[in-house]
Regions:
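Hydrophobic/aromatic residues located in beta-strands of well-ordered beta-sheets
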Residues: 5-7, 53, 82, 133
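Left-handed beta-helix
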Residues: 160-167
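A structural preference for short, hydrophobic beta-strand core positions in alpha/beta folds
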Residues: 7, 29-31, 135
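Hydrophobic C-terminal alpha-helix "anchor/cap" residues
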Residues: 1, 22, 124-125
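Short phosphate-binding loop-to-helix
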Residues: 11-76
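Conserved core of the sugar-phosphate nucleotidyltransferase
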Residues: 16, 63-146, 153-156, 160
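Short beta-strand/loop segment that forms part of the nucleotide-sugar
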Residues: 1-12
Length: 167
């Protein structure tokens, strides 16, 4: 069961609008490092006393809640370090869910290369033999579809898909 939803936000003036949205809608948030995404997560884990966490990125506003449930249920049943649906990817981009053991996440920080601090699960996937990772696989390979939204063009593309296709 998900106990808290927390939005991780950059310590950057451009993200003040997100903070205002969170305050207005009584959503918990945490502000952290702009330059080191991994450290932002560690700071949130420690300050908010988080044991495990589910990562869904901001460019994935159309995430399927059933996928979150599948990841959460698998993680809770077998005590994995990570349960994901991107290793290898079979779901569309923009439908990525990762549940990560907080202790393992913190312990791994000292071993990271610079590029692994930006993409927080890259280290685990690069060293997959050292970790218990389970991948949720889609019944149909949709890895070439992109449902993420990073630009206005993405938004209009997704809008068109939603109007014409069952997802």
């Amino acid at each position: 069961k998900i106990k808290k939803i927390i939005i991780l936000i950059l310590k950057n003036k451009s993200d003040d609008v997100i903070v205002e949205f969170c305050k207005k809608n009584k959503i918990k948030y945490f502000r952290g490092s702009l330059k080191n995404v991994y450290l932002r997560y560690i700071s949130a884990i420690k300050k908010l006393k988080i044991t495990n966490f589910i990562r869904i990125t901001g460019d994935s506003p159309m995430i399927n809640y059933k996928l979150i449930d599948m990841v959460l249920n698998r993680f809770n049943k077998k005590h994995y370090d990570i349960v994901t649906n991107v290793f290898p990817r079979s779901f569309p981009v923009g439908q990525s869910v990762e549940m990560i053991n907080g202790k393992i996440f913190i312990k791994s920080y000292k071993k990271l290369k610079i590029d692994e601090k930006e993409h927080i699960t890259k280290y685990f996937y690069n060293n997959f033999k050292k970790f218990k990772i389970f991948n949720i696989k889609s019944n149909k390979n949709c890895s070439k579809k992109n449902l993420s939204i990073n630009t206005y063009d993405d938004y209009y593309k997704i809008k068109k898909i939603m109007e014409n296709e069952k997802i």
